[in-house]
Amino acid sequence: MSRRKREEPWRYEAAIAEVETLIAQIESGELDLAEVVERFQQAAQTLKTCADFLEQKRQQVEIIIEQLGQEEEDLPES
């Protein structure tokens, strides 16, 4: 019976490390053109996922800041 490798949750830091690895492979000069294009495509897709993640987190932070501002307005003045 074969076991599936347990998928770990997606992490921004791991994705950036993956992109850095792909860039190093591309810059090594050891890949043929088809492999370079494949690695480039993988890096571009991973960076798009990272950008989407960062945008989502930015929006979450804005909501939190807005909520904090509203809570501050609701505090009684002393």
UniProtKB/Swiss-Prot annotation:
Q: Report the EC number(s), separated by commas if there are several.
A: 3.1.11.6
Compartment(s) where it occurs, according to its Swiss-Prot or TrEMBL record: Cytoplasm
| Keyword terms | Cytoplasm, Exonuclease, Hydrolase, Nuclease
Q: Which reaction does it catalyse?
A: Exonucleolytic cleavage in either 5'- to 3'- or 3'- to 5'-direction to yield nucleoside 5'-phosphates
List the Gene3D superfamilies: Exonuclease VII, small subunit (1.10.287.1040)
Name the GO terms of the biological process aspect.
DNA catabolic process
PANTHER family the UniProt entry points to: EXODEOXYRIBONUCLEASE 7 SMALL SUBUNIT
Q: What protein is this chain from?
A: Exodeoxyribonuclease 7 small subunit
Question: What species is this protein from?
Answer: Synechococcus sp. (strain JA-2-3B'a(2-13)) (Cyanobacteria bacterium Yellowstone B-Prime)
